[in-house]
Regions:
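Sequence-specific dsDNA recognition surfaces
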Residues: 41-60, 75-103
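A short beta-sheet element
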Residues: 97, 108-150
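Short hydrophobic-aromatic micro-motifs
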Residues: 70-73, 101, 106-109
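Short, positively charged
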Residues: 145-174
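Short, contiguous, well-structured surface segments enriched in hydrophobic/aromatic residues
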Residues: 44, 68-71
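Non-catalytic DNA-recognition/assembly elements of restriction-modification systems
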Residues: 1-58, 187-267
Length: 267
């Protein structure tokens, strides 16, 4: 059970609402916390950052990167490894050039699971992402991009992304909604400290991605494994959870990229 104490100052500005579900909602509580921060508040719109959402388009996929550009769904942006193996036809690249991600952008999932925030590093460059993703191109003139990302990914930013100012749940986020989010205009020294930490984390993520790729190459080299093709993925589909567990022994010569999973050897 949740309890709280309110006064007339909380009731009068909110159309005389007295219901507990309103005053105890996270959006209202965190909103009060932000109001009490002793610094000027600024909306994302007033930071002069570019916020936009792509137009719906029909996707034409191709087999490899020779004929396509790496494609990311909204759920892919939060993965440690964004090499999904999906490529959008280069024939679409001109009309969809504005959807190609660049370094130091902020992207936000805006439907389904909404409010997941990602700061793009160099590994995201030259990837086309779904139209259903809010893109923020930060402007450091008033708010440093690292601080903006840190705020949006905090509970104070997440709450504004996923709930209305009256505490209602938001089912879909649009650019106007994001532009209306407010954040404290902290001193430049503090913003720089936060920005430095976010930039460092982005750099470390790049190193982690490179290390993961190197490890994969080493494994394939020493185990004499080849890369999986699209046909391999189609042939060796997901296992059935109703299948009984079994143990067996296989010779090293029987192992390759398509059979390294134990399920593919089971009978």
């Amino acid at each position: 059970m949740k309890t709280s104490v309110i006064n007339t100052k909380s009731i009068l500005p909110n159309s005389f609402r007295f219901d507990p579900s309103f005053h105890l909602s996270e959006a209202i509580i965190l909103g009060k916390d932000l109001d009490n921060v002793p610094y000027e508040k600024i909306s994302i719109k007033d930071t002069n950052s570019k916020v936009f959402l792509g137009n719906i388009f029909s996707r034409i996929f191709v087999k490899d990167k020779e004929h396509g550009i790496p494609y990311l769904a909204a759920s892919d942006t939060v993965l440690a490894d964004i090499n999904t193996g999906r490529f959008l036809s280069k024939k679409q690249s001109k009309e969809l050039a504005y959807l190609i991600l660049k370094k130091d952008w902020i992207v936000i999932t805006c439907s389904g699971t909404i409010g997941n925030v990602t700061y793009t590093n160099s590994t995201f460059e030259n990837h086309i992402a779904t139209h259903d993703l809010i893109r923020i191109v930060p402007n450091d003139e008033k708010i440093l991009k690292g601080y903006l990302y840190a705020f949006l990914s905090s509970k104070y930013g997440y709450c504004q992304l996923t709930q209305s100012r009256f505490g209602g749940v938001v089912k879909h986020i649009n650019a106007d909604h994001v532009n209306g989010i407010t954040l404290p205009l902290f001193p430049e020294s503090f913003q720089m400290e936060v920005d430095d930490l976010i930039q460092e984390s982005a750099r470390l993520r790049e190193e982690a991605t490179e290390a993961l790729e190197d490890a994969s190459k080493l494994l394939k080299h020493y185990a004499s494994l080849s890369d999986l093709t699209e046909a391999d993925y189609d042939y060796y589909g997901p296992r059935s959870y109703e299948r009984q567990v079994s143990c067996f022994v296989k010779s090293r010569k029987d192992i390759d990229s398509t059979t390294i999973n134990a399920f593919n050897h089971s009978e």
